[in-house]
Amino acid sequence: MPGRGGLIALTLTLMFVILWARPASTQNDDADAALFERYIEALRRIAHVPGISAVILRDGRPVWQRGFGFANVDARVPATPDTLYDIASLTKTFTSTLLLQCVERGTLSLDERIARYSAAIPEPAATVRHVLTHTSQGTPGAAFRYDGDRFAALTSVVDSCHGRPFRQALATSILDRAAMTNSVPGHDLERPTPSLAALFDVPTLGRYEGSVKRLALPYQTAADGSAPAGYPPRDISASAGLLSSVVDLAKYDVAIDTNVFIFRASQELAWTNAVSTTGEALPYGLGWFIQRERGVRLVWHYGQWPQYSALYLKAPDRHLTLILLGNSGGLSEAFPMAGGDVMASPFAKAFVRIFIP
């Protein structure tokens, strides 16, 4: 009996046979979305994700959004585009934007030593840029090694250059500006301590509390399916912890593409591969993975907790975006994307094959 990875590969092979046999003339958004739905539902079951919410944007507007499975299995609460999830490491893309806002204002240089802001990185020569590009380990700048714990050191950098705590900067400089009214900068705001509550006004705290009620329950994948699980850490850092929905992340995507947060030149800098000290192009830029697939530029990030997972994939030159959120680790945990290849994900592979012919 093949394992889960083998079953996913077999399913993809069979479904790609169907796709390859489809006449090119039948390719359009409605037909493509219908075919993609079949992939998502089949992969959701094999990867043991109880619920998935998904959106596709083309030319700055959502052209398809759907929920699959359940946000709460026992209560049979369906996953919808408005369902909230912990988006895990997709939070890193927000951190990138917050730091580049500081660079634009002149309150930060990416080439400052990270030690000025945090003692968490032991390499004395490591800079903010090194941490942001996952090149701070060993000889800074020499090699890429994805490390979410190190990335969390950027929390204190945002605190300093924005002049306010990370979660408050995230709320005021990104969430509010993009009208992401259902997103919550930290699960701990459901029942905030007095010091956390002091960061936001009463209506905002009430909105956060209401939004958390739509948070999908967490599950962990197991050999025979998925099982209820505890929540991941409830606080937030530069590395992870934002709660959001695909509806709100679609607003974020549109705001990125219309330069609401930072100048286009700054965004393109974030989407440029870092270069090692030996001249090697690395798979990561400033808070984003970057690669080319069949000549098409892809910028992306994945999110991974044992209980939640996520995928955010953009083809900016094609004005095309996919966002997937799930309430187990199944969107990411079986697929080695940390090395820099989004095509290790069958979800991404299906999307690229269908929508980027």
Spans of features found by a protein language model:
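Active-site helix/loop module of the DD-peptidase/beta-lactamase fold
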Residues: 35, 51, 81, 86-90, ...
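Catalytic loop of the DD-peptidase/beta-lactamase superfamily, centered on the K-T-G motif
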Residues: 27-66, 164, 171-172, 176, ...
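Bacterial N-terminal signal peptides
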Residues: 9-19
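Well-ordered alpha-helical segments within folded domains of soluble proteins
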Residues: 95-96, 150-155, 247-250
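Boundary at the C-terminal end of the N-terminal hydrophobic targeting segment
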Residues: 21-26
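Carbohydrate-binding/catalytic loop surfaces
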Residues: 190-232, 236-238, 284, 289-291
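Flexible glycine/proline-enriched surface loops and loop-helix/loop-strand junctions
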Residues: 79-82, 136-140, 150-156, 229-238, ...
